[in-house]
Amino acid sequence: MKPQSSFNKLMFIPLVLFLLLVVAFLIQLTRNANGEDPTMLESALIGKPVPAFKLESLEQPGKTFDQAVLRDGKPILLNVWATWCPTCRAEHEYLNKLAAQGIRVVGLNYKDDRSKAVQWLNSLGNPYFLSLYDGDGMLGLDLGVYGAPETFLIDGQGVIRYRHAGDLNDRVWQQEILPLYKKYQGGA
């Protein structure tokens, strides 16, 4: 009797998992129908300092930086990117445009091949005033990165003020990030 009872319990597990997936799917459909932006990720880090880190420069192995580089009194965009990310390539031209306008962008090269990343920047242009190399993805993990690209607005004191998942484009910049950027630029 016991083996049959254990078998019945095991057969019940896939049904429960399936029902949980259906519920999660329906919740997301409802959110999308209500106009919620699926790229707007809630983050427990909003309003908190950037997690402590010590990372090498992408272009200069051995030269390290820590979170203090993001606390210089001026707002910064922290852009998580990788050469394996097709959406990163799509947003790269816009990042170059922002950099040309004087917007300070720090690149966080995420789980990537360093030499490919340097070559990529050399061929497509480098919008980053600083490129950090997160080869093992630990800072990305600490930031709660789901994938690339993601962009964080960091105020002049190193506090995360906004997070955007997906490509940074003109609509996102103008409607979501620029007003906050100006707010924290004015407070510098």
Swiss-Prot record:
It is a single-pass membrane protein. Its main location: membrane. Residues 1-9 are cytoplasmic. Keywords: Cell inner membrane, Cell membrane, Cytochrome c-type biogenesis, Disulfide bond, Membrane, Redox-active center, Transmembrane, Transmembrane helix. SUPFAM superfamilies: Thioredoxin-like (SSF52833). GO terms for molecular function: disulfide oxidoreductase activity. Residues 31-188 are periplasmic. Disulfide bonds join 85-88. Involved in disulfide bond formation. Catalyzes a late, reductive step in the assembly of periplasmic c-type cytochromes, probably the reduction of disulfide bonds of the apocytochrome c to allow covalent linkage with the heme. Possible subunit of a heme lyase. This is Thiol:disulfide interchange protein DsbE. It comes from Yersinia pestis.
